């Protein structure tokens, strides 16, 4: 290799500096890959390439990593900084073997044998010029842009045409000390490491580019030849008394309506547009957990992303983030309502496939869609769908629609060999563009049909939207899930493949709820959500600035010292910083008087801000319930607090998709935190410290509306134990409306009929709606709920129930 200060390399670096734009994956290798700056480091690359090393040199200079041009000097030993598995491919003839790599690696291992204190980190580095996966029928393009083994001439063309799409990916370091100690230092281990490295680089390329893309028409013909679709076409012809040719044409129409038409060229163009858009909209996008997803891809998993659905922006945000995190944007299941011109064709070429809201018993459409989904899984394309079925209008997660999850499960049951893993994704925003529209819809206004004019209208309103949040939750591998739920599932299916197992529907329901729980486990507590939570807990949605900052400091400390889960992310900075962020986003207003500053939510924005509060209400609902127990009792035993929370937790879990593994332990951790912060003292019982009562009262207010709902339900059940589920839902809803009118409750979810439906299902499951119900349990929970209400609210509920049911 020429010297790094030679005229040739200086010229090459100058050319690349003007032609090449490099994206680094991950963005911070030290933090994400646990690199140790104190230990010597060498880079491992697949192929020797001057242009690749020049691109790597630019990146290492920016990241503060050793330059690939500098020799590795460790304990008096001088070695190359870059080790390549294979030499450059000449324009004609064959490339040299891997002997130089083996010799270099043997030298490094020999040094470790001689010097026990030495530990060199080997960091694999992959470079990609463009990320086109190629098509099954590629010809000329593949010949010109052969990416696996390009000659220097092809590499020049790649830099010229694809230089703006250069990716450098760092992988986890390998300790040579560990290799030498565990596996020895002979030539055999050198050969083994070379094989492992080749497999690693091959897998990394698959993760970065994805599988080859099929010709769309060839895909259709392949699907139509499948046994299940041929059978469905025959049944369609028989049932509708049409010819099989006509039924086949209908199936082709369905395929054309459904199938994506992924275009790498469009994705590259969209990447530039979205980069401009995100920079215009957001001051930053916070990402947590991407490394675990990259590892799943690397390990050969079929990935299904299941994000929550807040906004139409969700379709763009997740794909953009995955692209920049070195993964292929997924094929996205989009509602057929988004298939309007010109957005529909663009979404389709960006990887969207379209699904009808309801299959309406259309067996042929169902068979076509299922076969298409199976094909995506079989060919290794990652998939994304929204299990809620639509955007949340309240900020809370919606009850999951199980159709797509059931079809994914059926694909596994039909014999996909690779592990299929659902990756829950929490998407959050400091500003959701549709919030105002959502609340108009909740107040009864008819939902507008999506059109291009709505898109232009949204773009017209672009402004400072703060930050976005993408948190990847705990993955769920379906084969492992099935092993837990039905250990003999493989045997059962082998014995009778056509028979639907009795355990399948319950298993799908459990899985859907686990996905939603894992999404909420990965919530992002931001400046807007936290400040909304505090201000909406006050009577006038306003608080003195210093008190607001103090309350936010308490919440931040709680989330860090008693973390909800390891997947949850918490805003950086202190309460003062969070308040300032919210003010800069114009989410809150501040006014000054002689006694200080007051931060508030404008009356016109109060309902809208409940949306952001509801994004994270589940993180604080149990601490809030504990605070309510403490502030409504002068003294209370610790065990009584644990018991009260245990009684309400099943309903909270059903309503808010909570996943606290050990509720008593969590309650005790929160109580210990309150004691540590000086809010509570404990002798034989727990007592609130008077000067901190206001902080606990503010925290307790966050659960008040939830307790009011439970008080309504259990007062009704105590008054009429034999009440039917449908009757309980309707009467609870009517009583909630009365309570809201009398006490000024404006939160949309308080009047949500679906929420009362969810609670009634859980009540039946818990035995509270059974004929042989234990009335003492109902009375106990009613009394507990009543005891935690304001006297005026309690009086309204009790009087209304008594008046309604007095005979």
Curated annotation (Swiss-Prot):
GO terms for molecular function: glycerol-3-phosphate O-acyltransferase activity. The keyword Cell inner membrane applies. Pathway: Phospholipid metabolism; CDP-diacylglycerol biosynthesis; CDP-diacylglycerol from sn-glycerol 3-phosphate: step 1/3. The keyword Membrane applies. Its EC number is 2.3.1.15. One of its GO terms (biological process) is fatty acid metabolic process. It is a peripheral membrane protein. It is an enzyme of class 2 (transferase). Keywords: Acyltransferase, Cell inner membrane, Cell membrane, Lipid biosynthesis, Lipid metabolism, Membrane, Phospholipid biosynthesis, Phospholipid metabolism, Transferase. It is found in: Cell inner membrane. Pfam families: Acyltransferase, GPAT_C. A motif (HXXXXD motif) lies at residues 308-313. CDD domains: LPLAT_DHAPAT-like. It catalyses: sn-glycerol 3-phosphate + an acyl-CoA = a 1-acyl-sn-glycero-3-phosphate + CoA. The HXXXXD motif is essential for acyltransferase activity and may constitute the binding site for the phosphate moiety of the glycerol-3-phosphate. This is Glycerol-3-phosphate acyltransferase. It comes from Shewanella baltica (strain OS185).
């Amino acid at each position: 290799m020429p010297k790094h200060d030679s005229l040739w390399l200086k010229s090459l670096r100058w050319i690349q500096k003007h032609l090449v734009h490099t994206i680094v994956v991950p963005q911070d290798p030290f933090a994400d890959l646990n690199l140790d700056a104190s230990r010597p480091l060498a880079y491992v690359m697949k192929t020797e390439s001057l242009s690749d090393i020049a691109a790597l040199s630019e990146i290492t200079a920016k990241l503060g990593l050793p330059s690939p041009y500098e020799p590795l000097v460790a304990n008096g030993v001088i070695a190359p900084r870059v080790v390549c598995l294979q030499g450059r491919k000449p324009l004609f003839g064959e490339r040299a073997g891997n002997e130089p790599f083996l010799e270099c690696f043997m030298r490094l291992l020999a040094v470790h044998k001689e010097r026990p204190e030495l530990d060199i980190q080997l960091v694999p580095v992959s470079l990609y010029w463009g990320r086109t996966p190629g098509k099954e029928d590629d010809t000329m393009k593949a010949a010109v842009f052969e990416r696996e083994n390009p000659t220097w001439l092809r590499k020049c063309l790649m830099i010229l045409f694809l230089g703006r799409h250069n990716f450098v990916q760092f992988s986890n370091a390998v300790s040579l000390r560990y290799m030498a100690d565990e596996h020895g230092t002979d030539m055999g281990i050198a050969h083994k490491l070379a094989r492992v490295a080749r497999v690693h680089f091959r897998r990394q390329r698959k993760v970065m580019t994805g599988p080859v893309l099929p010709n769309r028409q060839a895909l259709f013909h392949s699907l139509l030849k499948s046994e299940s679709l041929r059978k469905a076409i025959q049944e369609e012809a028989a049932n509708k008394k049409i010819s099989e040719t006509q039924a086949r044409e209908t199936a082709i129409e369905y395929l054309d309506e459904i199938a994506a038409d992924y275009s790498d060229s469009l994705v590259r163009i969209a990447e530039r547009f979205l980069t401009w858009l995100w920079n215009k909209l957001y001051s930053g996008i916070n990402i947590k957990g991407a490394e675990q997803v990259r590892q799943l891809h690397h390990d050969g998993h079929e990935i299904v992303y299941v994000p929550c659905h807040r906004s139409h922006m969700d379709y763009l945000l997740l794909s953009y983030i995955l692209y920049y995190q070195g993964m292929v944007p997924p094929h996205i299941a989009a509602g057929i309502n988004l298939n309007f011109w010109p957005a529909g064709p663009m979404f389709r070429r960006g990887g969207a496939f379209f699904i009808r809201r309801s299959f309406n018993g259309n067996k042929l459409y169902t068979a076509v869609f299922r076969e298409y989904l199976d094909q995506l899984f079989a060919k290794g394309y990652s998939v994304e769908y929204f299990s809620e079925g639509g955007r949340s209008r309240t900020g809370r997660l919606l009850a999951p629609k199980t159709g797509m999850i059931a079809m994914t499960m059926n694909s596994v049951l039909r014999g996909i060999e690779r592990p299929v893993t659902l990756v829950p994704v929490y998407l959050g925003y400091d500003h959701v563009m549709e919030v105002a529209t959502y609340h108009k819809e909740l107040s009864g206004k008819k939902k507008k049909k999506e059109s291009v004019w709505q898109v232009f209208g949204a773009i017209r309103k672009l402004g400072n939207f703060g930050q976005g949040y993408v948190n990847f939750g705990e993955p769920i591998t379906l084969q492992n899930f099935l092993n837990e739920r039905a250990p003999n599932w493989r045997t059962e299916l082998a014995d009778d493949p056509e028979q639907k197992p009795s355990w399948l529907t319950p298993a799908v329901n459990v899985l859907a709820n686990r996905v939603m729980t894992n999404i909420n486990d990965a919530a992002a507590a931001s400046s807007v959500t936290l400040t909304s939570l505090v201000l909406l807990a006050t009577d006038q949605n306003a608080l003195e600035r210093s008190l607001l900052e103090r309350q936010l400091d308490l919440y931040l400390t709680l989330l860090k010292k008693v973390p909800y889960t390891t997947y949850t992310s918490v805003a950086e900075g202190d309460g003062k910083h969070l308040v300032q962020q919210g003010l800069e986003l114009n989410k809150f207003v501040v006014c000054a008087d002689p006694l200080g500053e007051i931060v508030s939510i404008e009356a016109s924005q109060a309902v809208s801000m409940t949306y952001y509060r509801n994004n994270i209400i589940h993180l604080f609902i149990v601490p809030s319930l504990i605070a309510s127990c403490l502030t409504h009792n002068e003294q209370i035993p610790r065990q009584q607090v644990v018991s009260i929370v245990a009684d309400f937790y099943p309903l909270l879990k059903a309503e808010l998709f909570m996943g606290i593994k050990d509720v008593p332990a969590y309650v005790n951790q929160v109580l210990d935190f309150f004691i540590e912060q000086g809010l509570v003292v404990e002798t034989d019982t727990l007592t609130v410290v008077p000067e901190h009562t206001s902080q606990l009262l503010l925290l307790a207010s966050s659960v008040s509306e939830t307790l009011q709902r439970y008080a309504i339900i259990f007062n009704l059940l105590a008054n009429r134990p034999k009440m039917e589920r449908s009757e309980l839902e309707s009467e609870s809803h009517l009583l909630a409306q009365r309570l809201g009118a009398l006490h000024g409750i404006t939160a949309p979810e308080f009047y949500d009929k679906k929420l009362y439906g969810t609670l009634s299902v859980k009540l039946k499951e818990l035995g509270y709606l059974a004929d042989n119900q234990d009335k003492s349990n109902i009375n106990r929970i009613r009394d507990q709920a009543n005891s935690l209400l304001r006297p005026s609210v309690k009086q309204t509920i009790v009087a209304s129930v008594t008046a309604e049911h007095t005979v």
